[in-house]
């Protein structure tokens, strides 16, 4: 389902960063082409957010799978937005759900 959010204009409606036990979790509620999605990222590390104003608009996400490269659990996936690089981080796991 991440393909539905790649290289498309996305509006970030809500951004929630939460510490659970010894890990960070990031939850985004986004809108793309009049469809709302909830994206949850677990065991987030190296989180960078630059000059982001709400409601923010980005041009899609790129998700790079590093599992086959032998990277550590905290960096199984690398996520960043296209073009502006306003959001960049690594995570162990993610979940995307459509919310209509």
Show the residue positions of the predicted features.
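Surface-exposed, interaction-prone regions used to assemble/regulate multi-protein complexes
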Residues: 1-100
């Amino acid at each position: 389902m991440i393909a539905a959010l790649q290289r498309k204009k996305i509006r970030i409606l809500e951004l929630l960063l939460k510490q659970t036990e010894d890990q960070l979790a990031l939850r985004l509620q986004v809108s793309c082409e009049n469809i709302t999605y909830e994206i949850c990222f677990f065991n987030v590390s190296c989180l960078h957010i630059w000059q982001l104003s709400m409601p923010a608009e980005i041009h899609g996400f790129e998700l790079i799978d590093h599992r086959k490269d032998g990277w550590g659990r905290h960096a199984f996936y690398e996520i960043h937005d296209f073009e502006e690089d306003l959001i960049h981080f690594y995570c162990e796991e993610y979940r995307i759900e459509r919310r209509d």
